[in-house]
A protein has these predicted regions:
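Catalytic cores of nucleophile-dependent amide-cleaving enzymes
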Residues: 439-524, 528
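Long, folded non-catalytic interaction modules
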Residues: 43-73, 78-80, 88-90, 150-304
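Structural motif
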Residues: 175-179, 391-395, 421-424, 443-445, ...
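Acidic, contiguous N-terminal accessory segments
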Residues: 6-8, 16-17, 25-26, 92, ...
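Caspase-like cysteine protease fold
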Residues: 517-638
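A domain-level signal for caspase-like cysteine endopeptidase catalytic cores
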Residues: 283-439
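Mixed-charge (acidic/basic) macromolecular-recognition segments
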Residues: 110-145, 226-349
């Protein structure tokens, strides 16, 4: 993960291996003109007269209308701009100048090697040992709250003969009952504290012996909500105290405790966290993710992926969903198949994103499995071009083929190839799913035997592998087929739990594709898209739905616009992240992702906000693109 900060004078990319700064004094956001390689993870597109980079660069030797500069240090920054740009270098950096404001695309990537796996016994104590070792790699200071500065967590491997080091002298001790569920729930907090996590206590407790500090917790199930609130508070206070170049957050949470960033950063982590843990202050942040885990050793093996994302962990508890709750009713339109799944409603904790790492199909959470995380780790995805395929095996749903134009227009920040197929046979469709590519969008019918084709049905279980990183099976009752695609090699996808109307399927498909192309994750794109139809809960995500098919070039925000007489209320919503920030375009202040405020603007200001931003807008309950909405408002005299 690379941290991408928008600063007062440009941008700063921060990674595990270093940082690089781009400075420009006249940057204006704009739709991309020059394609970036698909290997970039984030960046920005806009226009300027001049920009400089504080790292050595190499130029693409191939003559072209587009110039490419790439830093020779890590993280790797890629600049693409027209041949009219004049480049000067001095060995330590480069400056690009234009006679008039000109389009520039900036992308950043970083290749970080995951550490060697940790081998531990397949037991609660073994898992606790792995969590303890993972916490040793964190920075000492409050900058551990900045996601890009947290090193990758080592994978876990099991060996019953592996030995544990019981001679632990870490300043912070976290003891829990000798049961896997308590270890899993405690893991995110113990990891973030850099604590020694051990088993054997009758009730959970954090102790800092040198300070004679002790904090007891209530046993499960209350333990889960208590650890969640504690971790939220620690990250919020660390975020207020950290000093990451290019970022400045409000330190009001510290001031409320009569602390300053200087006081906090000057002491050892154990002293800092004893102070924070003892504080009577509620968690003041919207959390990004919670995962509900069935306590088995096989699922515990995936804990490093959850710690990498700093997901909260809760016990997997759920109740059956009644047909009434799913808004099932007599529907006059015809259904496109009848392969239904009886879903569960999980008992959700805090968070915007919810993952279900347990048996059963669920609503309001994405169903993930160990295979999804294994697939994400094993895939290299180092191709410089996104490869997308749209398949329509239902002539009455051909309107979704128009998504090809959306993908072309909205993924043009990066190099993209798109294929369109209609009425594929079972063999042809199998080859589509098996070949390596970024994404497959399937429209058609799903029945008990599989996805319907002109010559029969294709069952995902018959595939040798699933080569698509992500997918959307926009067909009735496609849940089981989607689960199988993940088991066969995909990372995540969108599916349906039951029969859906053609019209609603098309509406969700168009919105989902539009948002996915804008750099949204599978989970967030589906969560927003399904709000557009009354039976949206019939759509679900499987696998690690935090995956994106396109780089997030910018914040990947959603503008929510509400008319208020002659004025408009605007919210610039950026999805929460584990300690990440964004720069509010209205105030210029850095805010934690997931925190936003409403700004009231007049017509002229609204148009200026919308123009030059290729981002989705929720306006009067419908999704639009900002530039298109600006043109409509202008034509209406608004």
């Amino acid at each position: 993960m690379v941290g991408w900060l928008s600063t007062e004078t440009g941008f700063r990319a921060i990674g595990q291996t270093g940082a690089v700064t781009v400075e420009t004094d006249d940057w204006e956001r704009a739709r991309p003109v020059h394609e970036l390689p698909a290997t970039v993870s984030t960046g920005a597109t806009g226009r300027c007269r001049r920009l400089s980079v504080n790292a050595p660069v190499a130029a693409d030797p191939e003559p072209s209308d587009t110039q490419t500069l790439t830093t020779t240090t890590s993280p790797t920054l890629t600049l693409r701009f027209s041949s009219a740009g004049a480049v000067t270098t001095d060995g330590d950096g480069a400056t690009v100048s234009f006679q008039t404001p000109s389009p520039v695309s900036i992308g950043v990537s970083e290749r970080v090697h995951r550490p060697e796996p940790l081998t531990v016994p397949p037991s609660p104590a073994g898992i606790a040992t792995a969590v303890t070792a993972a916490g040793d790699r964190l920075p000492d200071g409050p900058e551990r709250s900045f996601p890009a500065l947290r090193p990758a967590v080592p994978r876990i491997e099991f060996d019953a003969s592996a030995t544990r080091d019981d001679d632990d002298t870490r300043p912070i001790q976290f003891t829990v009952p000798d049961e896997l569920e308590s270890v899993l729930v405690a893991a995110p907090l113990a990891y973030y504290l850099g604590a020694s996590l051990t088993v054997g206590a009758s009730r959970p407790r954090i102790e800092i012996p040198a300070l004679e500090f002790s904090l007891p917790f209530t046993p499960l199930p209350a333990f889960a909500s208590e650890t969640a609130a504690t971790l939220q508070r620690l990250v919020a206070l660390d975020s207020a105290a950290r000093r990451v170049e290019g970022e400045r957050l409000d330190d009001a949470p510290l001031a409320a405790l009569e602390l300053t960033p200087d006081h906090v950063t000057a002491v050892e982590p154990s002293v800092r966290y004893a102070t924070f843990l003892d504080a009577d202050q509620p968690a003041a942040t919207t959390w990004h993710r919670s995962t509900y885990v069935e306590p088995t050793i096989e699922r515990a093996r995936i804990l490093p992926a959850l710690l990498d994302q700093l997901s909260l962990v809760y016990p997997a508890e759920a109740t059956a969903v009644s047909p009434q709750e799913l808004l099932e009713s007599a529907l006059e339109d015809f259904f496109r198949g009848v392969v239904s799944v009886t879903p569960l409603a999980p008992e959700l904790g805090v968070g915007v994103s919810h993952g279900w790492l347990a048996d059963g199909a669920v609503v309001d959470a994405f169903k993930t499995t160990p295979a999804a995380y294994d697939n994400a780790t094993e895939r290299t995805d180092d191709a410089e071009t996104l490869r997308l395929t749209i398949v329509s095996n239902d002539p009455e749903m051909d309107e979704e083929l128009a998504l090809a134009e959306t993908y072309r227009n909205r993924t043009n920040a990066v190099s993209t190839e798109i294929e369109i197929h209609e009425s594929l046979t079972t063999g042809e469709l199998a080859r589509v799913f098996e070949r390596p590519q970024t994404y497959v969008h399937y429209v058609g019918h799903c029945e008990e035997a599989g996805l319907r084709c002109p010559d029969g049905h294709l069952s995902a279980s018959s595939l040798s592998r699933s080569g698509a990183r992500a997918f959307f099976l926009n067909a009735c009752g496609s849940y089981r087929e989607g689960e199988t695609l993940v088991e066969k090699g995909s990372v995540a996808g969108a599916v349906t739990l039951d029969a859906v109307l053609n019209e609603q399927a098309a509406t969700v498909g168009q919105a989902f594709g539009t948002l996915l192309a804008a750099g949204y994750s599978v989970r967030r794109a589906l969560a927003l898209a399904r709000r557009r139809v009354p039976m949206g809960r019939d759509y679900a995500a499987v696998g690690d739905a935090t995956v994106r098919i396109t780089p997030s070039v910018g914040d990947a925000p959603l503008l929510v616009v509400e008319p208020r007489g002659d004025e408009f209320a605007i919210r610039y919503e950026v999805a929460p992240e584990s300690g990440g920030t964004y720069r509010d375009p209205f105030t210029g202040r850095h805010r934690r992702r997931g925190a936003w405020q409403t700004t009231v603007v007049d017509r002229a200001r609204l148009r200026s906000v919308l123009e030059g931003r290729g981002i989705p807008v929720e306006f009067d309950g419908s999704f639009r693109w900002s530039g298109e909405l600006a043109a409509d408002l202008r034509s209406q005299g608004l």
